Amino acid sequence: IGEVLIDLTQTGKDARGIPQFAANPGGAPANLAVAASRLGAQTAFIGKVGADAFGRYLKEVLAENKVDVSGMAVDANHPTTMAVVSVDATGERDFSFYRSANADVMLCKEDISDEALKASKIVHFGSVSLTADPSRTATLDAAARAKKLGATITYDPNYRANLWKNKEDAIAQMKAPLPLVDILKVSDEELPLLTGTTDCESGTAQLAQNGIRLIFVTLGANGVFYRFGDKTGHVAGVPCKVGDTNGAGDTFFGAALSKLCKEELDTLTVDKLESILAFANKAASITTSRHGAIPAMPTLAEVEG
């Protein structure tokens, strides 16, 4: 559940020095749905796009990647969201969003049916949906309904500073869903925002007090730290030449969830979890070695090969 948008990514400059941009599909929950789908999971996307060329294109991209788009709504009065993405020499990204009254924010409770939630083993969302209403209320309501219906709730507090009024508001809203969450992914940059510490052991122990059963802290090239109940550990990253990091975290989480949806947390062993995380790290490294998010995401054969 969440945003799907156009990433306008600079591809270079023409002979006159005018920047050239490619319109790429993006949005963390949509990226994750595609990543998991390419790796063999059945996925569906619930969100809202404008009645415009970009909205039609995004729906087509998700459908082409075998993501069920029957829950995607179209808003005739608000345009599809865009972000301008610039990538520096190390592959790190900077986002500028065009999103004051755009379609993804207009997702409302009525757009998310109980039938869609009942059909889901895992229901995932991110914090971009929580920046404003009605999407904030719709997302939290859907997560609460899905939890009651027996789904596993997964969450990525995907912090984008320029989407929030201020850091304090961001932290408060990003923390709000934590008591609903079963599986959480945070980056090493988001951990101190939510906990006040950069220490993975103490930070995840603090987060686990919300009842979160499985927590991942992604560490970029250094892999992932995990907390599973009272057990903690680290799984090394897979070295690669960086193209750009766009979609790497979404690929990691999508890959992990594509495997975890076949497991029960009650019976999951640490050995099995670590093999799932090694698989997810490899998938993320493949995405990182290429350019773009969705176009860069690997197939099952590529990760297992």
What are these regions (language model features)?
Residues 34, 82-86, 223-226:
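Short beta-strand scaffold segments in enzyme catalytic cores
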Residues 144-145, 196-305:
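Conserved phosphate-binding/catalytic region of the ribokinase-like
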Residues 1-68, 107:
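Glycine-rich phosphate/adenosyl-contacting loop at the front of the ribokinase-like
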Residues 128-205, 222-223:
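Conserved beta-alpha-beta core of the PfkB/ribokinase-like small-molecule kinase fold
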Residues 42, 152, 183, 213-214:
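Proline-centered loop/turn at the N-terminus of a beta-strand
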Residues 42-125, 304-305:
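Conserved N-terminal subdomain of the carbohydrate kinase-like
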